[in-house]
Amino acid sequence: MEPGLWLLFGLTVTSAAGFVPCSQSGDAGRRGVSQAPTAARSEGDCEETVAGPGEETVAGPGEGTVAPTALQGPSPGSPGQEQAAEGAPEHHRSRRCTCFTYKDKECVYYCHLDIIWINTPEQTVPYGLSNYRGSFRGKRSAGPLPGNLQLSHRPHLRCACVGRYDKACLHFCTQTLDVSSNSRTAEKTDKEEEGKVEVKDQQSKQALDLHHPKLMPGSGLALAPSTCPRCLFQEGAP
């Protein structure tokens, strides 16, 4: 009975630890008849062992073995990974168009809907910013471009739209720049008109100075002293 008690003690300890060793086929011959129920119970326990998420139970003839597969990792279609994928969707950076220069802040905020901020709002690095000009990039040559069109005759765009049929984006990349250029030309014309008016005023002042009595030769008239600035007197008068 002593070996049977030791066997029961070992089984209880190992079951408390979470692992039940399976009895070997050679042990059955060395054990007595009184140990047969215990061995049968241990074999039943091995067969009824529930495999965890990373283990597989393989039952052989007369014995049960546990093949651990924890090193292989969870399967791709496990429910845990599906829940993680549903809970944390991938972050997709949307981009409507590509600006030709990062100095155009309005274009940067319009095209790049997701902006990476660095240190301060003044220093921004838009996602996907590049100098891509599409088909409007010309070669370094003085000759005509394909299609007999010079680069200067092509419309100067401030950005390149991702979607070809995005009318709002195309309108922003073309019409907005035209409005700004028109405003600049209007400012230039206003400044030119102001300059012309100033030149005319200076010319009129010079003409008045030439007709002044002090500057006219042989008039014999001069301005009175500072005590009487409005008085005129004739030279040589008593």
From Swiss-Prot:
Transmembrane segments: none
Signal sequence coordinates: 1-16
GO process annotations (BP): axon extension; axon guidance; blood circulation; cell population proliferation; cell surface receptor signaling pathway; cell-cell signaling; establishment of localization in cell; intracellular calcium ion homeostasis
Region (Endothelin-like): 159-173
Main location as per UniProt: secreted
Compositional bias of kind Basic and acidic residues: 185-212
Keywords: Cleavage on pair of basic residues, Deafness, Disease variant, Disulfide bond, Hirschsprung disease, Secreted, Signal, Vasoactive, Vasoconstrictor, Waardenburg syndrome
Alphabetized Pfam families for the sequence: Endothelin (PF00322)
GO cellular component terms attached to this protein's record: extracellular region; extracellular space
Subcellular location: Secreted
Consequence of substituting residue 224 to T: Probable risk factor for HSCR4
Region (Disordered): 24-89, 183-219
Disulfide pairings: 97-111, 99-107
Disease listed for this protein: Hirschsprung disease 4: A disorder of neural crest development characterized by absence of enteric ganglia along a variable length of the intestine. It is the most common cause of congenital intestinal obstruction. Early symptoms range from complete acute neonatal obstruction, characterized by vomiting, abdominal distention and failure to pass stool, to chronic constipation in the older child. Waardenburg syndrome 4B: A disorder characterized by the association of Waardenburg features (depigmentation and deafness) with the absence of enteric ganglia in the distal part of the intestine (Hirschsprung disease).
Protein known as: Endothelin-3
Species, as recorded: Homo sapiens (Human)
